[in-house]
Amino acid sequence: MVPTQVTIFSIIMYVLESLVIIVQSCTTVAVLFREWMHFQRLSPVEIILISLGISHFCLQWTSMLYNFGTYSRPVLLFWKVSVVWEFMNVLTFWLTSLLAVLYCVKVSSFSHPVFLWLRLKILKLVLWLLLGALIASCLSIIPSVVKYHIQMELLTLDHLPKNSSLILRLQMFEWYFSNPFKMIGFGVPFLVFLISIILLTVSLVQHWGQMKHYSSSSSSLRAQCTVLKSLATFFIFFTSYFLTIVVSFIGTVFDKKSWFWVCEAVIYGLVCIHFTSLMMSNPTLKKALRLQFWSPESS
């Protein structure tokens, strides 16, 4: 059982993190949209970042609505909000994975024909990749929609004995189909992310070794170190976010209700840090943040 003080502290942290994520999302979309208005073009990475900003904005508002609406009374009145939350979560995973793929294609030094072809076609492919992410996210929530309909049916069958064959069949569908499919929905984009990060890390380490062998300038080596550190941060926080989401879905390791707000504070704290690292990795967003918070020094 979690102490009341810890629960209250977790709720306060969750609300503050939610506000920060909403501000981050609005800033990302506003800055990059202004960039598009000025230059009438955006890079594939910036297109994904705008999509991530919109996704995080919707995800956070949905999360707050669902958490405060159903925590005290876990009735299925908000099941549609829960489905939207899950959809936005899976979409966020796919968009982050696409971002890792873009970084891998753009930065890696592999000379395989597939990488060369992707570098040439990536600008045309990015919209198709976004469409694919939307379709995959929609498909991944189908079992959850069925699951919530099943739970609604179970509420109407309270008059039946607990060991009724109909109730048992409905519960078996939920446990043996819905939950594994949900894990697949989160696992596939994470696997894509993992493969992209591994390939990119291997490429950067090889390139770094070549630069040291040929006695490249210290500034170039420092730049490579900075990229590797950013990559490590990207990997650590997104992996932590994935594992925390998985544990919160399983909910069998601990008393899920008593640890609910602690889990939410941890999850969205990781989201906040991860999104900050993404913003700081983009030159346009980084420049806008510096002008916003350190304008006297930058001028």
Swiss-Prot record:
- Tissue note: Expressed in subsets of taste receptor cells of the tongue and palate epithelium and exclusively in gustducin-positive cells. Expressed in the antrum and fundus (part of the stomach), duodenum and in gastric endocrine cells.
Q: Recorded GO terms, molecular function?
A: bitter taste receptor activity; G protein-coupled receptor activity; taste receptor activity
UniProt xrefs under InterPro entries: TAS2R (IPR007960)
Query: Record keywords: Glycoprotein included?
Result: yes
Provide the topology term for how it sits in the membrane.
Answer: Multi-pass membrane protein
Annotated Gene Ontology cellular components are: endoplasmic reticulum; external side of plasma membrane; membrane; trans-Golgi network
Which Pfam family is an annotated match for this chain, by its short name? TAS2R
Additional comments on file? Several bitter taste receptors are expressed in a single taste receptor cell.
* Subunit-level organization: Interacts with RTP3 and RTP4.
Name of the protein in question: Taste receptor type 2 member 16
Native organism is: Rattus norvegicus
* Taxonomic lineage of the native organism: Eukaryota, Metazoa, Chordata, Craniata, Vertebrata
Gene name of the record: Tas2r16
